[in-house]
Amino acid sequence: KCIKKLVALTLAAVLALTMLTACGGTPSVQDTTEATKQIVDNINAVRTENGLSALEINTAVTDVAQKYLAVQEKKKLNLISEENYKKEMRELSAIKVAGRSYIGYLATTTDSSGEKSLTKEAWQKTYDSGKVNYSDYRIVHSADAKYVGVVMKQISNGKYITVVVTY
């Protein structure tokens, strides 16, 4: 009887740990998936049609985007104070990649996967907006931008966070 209880408790503990850490065999954050590649293709279509160079997907920039996503997730789930959120965002914007400074940034939270809202038409609208002080505008408008990182994740409240960063 004692062994059965021990096995049952161990199994329950393993199951609980699996649920808490989301170790179910599938990654919670995608790397370069079809969805994130589609977003980059949409950005590059707008850039090249407007005489700018296409952005290159860069692993280091994608890592920075991953860090931005983690901060956004904490904010959306109310796991971080506004003060700490601003501090972490400032720290992230100071990161350099290949000697380059951050140029553009966009984080969206949507009910469905990010590529459904970050279409070529949406990026063209951003390009045409003339909002030069907006970080998302610089993603499609900056001639200095060379690298891009895009990450997407469905968080525990069912929403999707998509982050785009350019350097």
Regions found by a protein language model. Name each.
Residues 31-96, 137, 145-148:
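Short, well-ordered surface patches within globular domains
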Residues 6-7, 29-31:
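Short, contiguous strand/loop micro-motifs
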Residues 1-10:
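Bacterial N-terminal signal peptides that target proteins for export
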Residues 10-17:
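Alpha-helical transmembrane segments
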Residues 24-27:
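Bacterial signal peptide processing site
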Residues 87-167:
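A well-ordered secondary-structure block
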Residues 18-22:
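C-terminal motif of bacterial Sec signal peptides marking the signal peptidase cleavage site
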